[in-house]
């Protein structure tokens, strides 16, 4: 059984890696893989058609210069799928790229089951997107329990498989071991800083984060900074932190979970990492910034409308994690919010309680989402073969 998988960013790559591991557990040597992915998927045996980093871009204006190359990659990917004729295509998140792949295959009549993993946020965007997905997909796998109803009413078979953060290692970090390894005293305050996993994110956030650290240095001269990062942006992050006003250490790979357990608070770009911080019970301030033009287009013309952007807050409909977005992504505001979490135990406890409620809504304590997704893919392929052989 050949499964073709496509991930366009690190969070999708992590999902893809867990899905591949579960498929191998279920099928053993009876499954092989092709497609596009990053370090997690490569670790499970994928040879990526081209570097996933070419697709890791966020923001409407930021993506414009990349469009010609991205469209060439779309054409290349469709051609590769036509040649390989896999038993199923599983695209993971990144609908801007993956939607073009799915639509292109349908338009060409390529006989491959078309599966997408991670639903676009239809409550944030105009709900007409549900019709778009229903036209080009055969099966949709969702992370959130309320999502299937949006798509099933359009006739798209949709299954909720759960959010992978609940099965990850974020809650199992060893903070004491991390402090010993890196020479941090047990009582020294540590701040975890996460400036994003895309170049378009770090380009907007590294500078204000550096200024935030300078402000915090005045209030907490003994504070140390730990910066977990990913391969896509590791070089630029490592270069940027050299000029920060506090001792700043960059860590990569799974050590980030030990870092989460060791730290006292976090400053993070909005994204999947907010859920990981919740799992690690690490109080966090969440921020994000895109170009003003991107923000204007998204709200005015594309119908983006959100009370919150952080999934923890969305799930419980309250500001559990402070959000400082766009014009509020300012060093003075970021520093004040971080200081509050470093010094106010009541605020830390309140955030932990709210985060726990959000995680329970994602299925904390239930069956592994990766295994549920693998079972859904296998069952769908087998059902299709049975119908064709009828």
Swiss-Prot record:
Coiled coil: none annotated. It comes from the Bacteria. GO terms for cellular component: membrane. Pathway: Bacterial outer membrane biogenesis; LPS lipid A biosynthesis. It catalyses: a lipid X + a UDP-2-N,3-O-bis[(3R)-3-hydroxyacyl]-alpha-D-glucosamine = a lipid A disaccharide + UDP + H(+). InterPro entries: Glyco_trans_19 (IPR003835). Keywords: Glycosyltransferase, Lipid A biosynthesis, Lipid biosynthesis, Lipid metabolism, Transferase. One of its GO terms (biological process) is lipid A biosynthetic process. Condensation of UDP-2,3-diacylglucosamine and 2,3-diacylglucosamine-1-phosphate to form lipid A disaccharide, a precursor of lipid A, a phosphorylated glycolipid that anchors the lipopolysaccharide to the outer membrane of the cell. Belongs to the LpxB family. HAMAP family: LpxB. This is Lipid-A-disaccharide synthase. It comes from Paramagnetospirillum magneticum (strain ATCC 700264 / AMB-1) (Magnetospirillum magneticum). The lineage of its organism: Bacteria, Pseudomonadati, Pseudomonadota, Alphaproteobacteria, Rhodospirillales. The gene is lpxB.
């Amino acid at each position: 059984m050949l499964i073709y998988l496509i991930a366009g960013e690190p969070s999708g790559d992590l999902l893809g890696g867990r899905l591949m591991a579960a498929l191998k557990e279920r099928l053993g040597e009876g499954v092989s893989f092709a497609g596009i992915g990053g370090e997690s998927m490569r670790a499970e045996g994928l040879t990526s058609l081209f570097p996933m980093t070419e697709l890791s871009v966020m923001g409407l204006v930021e993506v414009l210069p990349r469009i010609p190359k991205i469209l060439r990659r779309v054409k290349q990917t469709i051609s590769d799928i036509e040649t390989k004729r896999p038993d199923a295509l599983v695209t993971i998140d990144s609908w801007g790229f993956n939607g073009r792949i799915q639509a292109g295959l349908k338009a060409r009549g390529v006989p491959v089951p078309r599966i997408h993993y991670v639903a676009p946020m239809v409550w944030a965007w105009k709900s007409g997107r549900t019709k778009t997905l229903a036209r080009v997909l055969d099966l949709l796998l969702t992370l959130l329990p309320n999502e299937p109803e949006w798509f099933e009413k359009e006739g798209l078979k949709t299954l909720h498989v759960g959010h992978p953060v609940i099965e990850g290692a974020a809650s199992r970090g060893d903070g004491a071991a991390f402090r010993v390894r890196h020479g941090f005293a047990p009582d020294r305050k540590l701040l975890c800083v996460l400036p994003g996993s895309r170049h378009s994110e770090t380009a907007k956030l590294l500078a204000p984060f550096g200024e935030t650290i300078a402000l915090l240095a005045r209030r907490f001269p003994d504070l140390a900074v730990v910066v977990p990062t990913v391969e896509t942006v590791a070089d630029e992050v490592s270069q940027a932190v050299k000029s920060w006003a506090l001792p700043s250490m960059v860590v990569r790979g799974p050590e980030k979970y030990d870092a989460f357990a060791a730290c006292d608070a976090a400053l993070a770009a909005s994204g999947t990492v907010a859920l990981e911080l919740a799992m690690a019970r690490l109080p966090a301030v969440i921020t994000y910034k895109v170009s003003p033009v991107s923000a204007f287009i998204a709200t005015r013309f594309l119908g983006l409308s959100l009370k919150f952007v952080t999934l923890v807050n969305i799930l419980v409909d309250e500001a559990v994690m402070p959000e400082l977005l766009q014009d509020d992504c300012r060093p003075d505001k970021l520093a004040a919010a971080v200081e509050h979490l470093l010094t106010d135990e009541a605020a830390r406890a309140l955030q932990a309680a709210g985060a726990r409620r959000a995680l329970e809504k994602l299925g904390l304590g239930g069956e592994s989402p990766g295994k549920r997704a693998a079972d859904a893919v296998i069952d769908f392929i087998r059902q299709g073969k049975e119908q064709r052989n009828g």
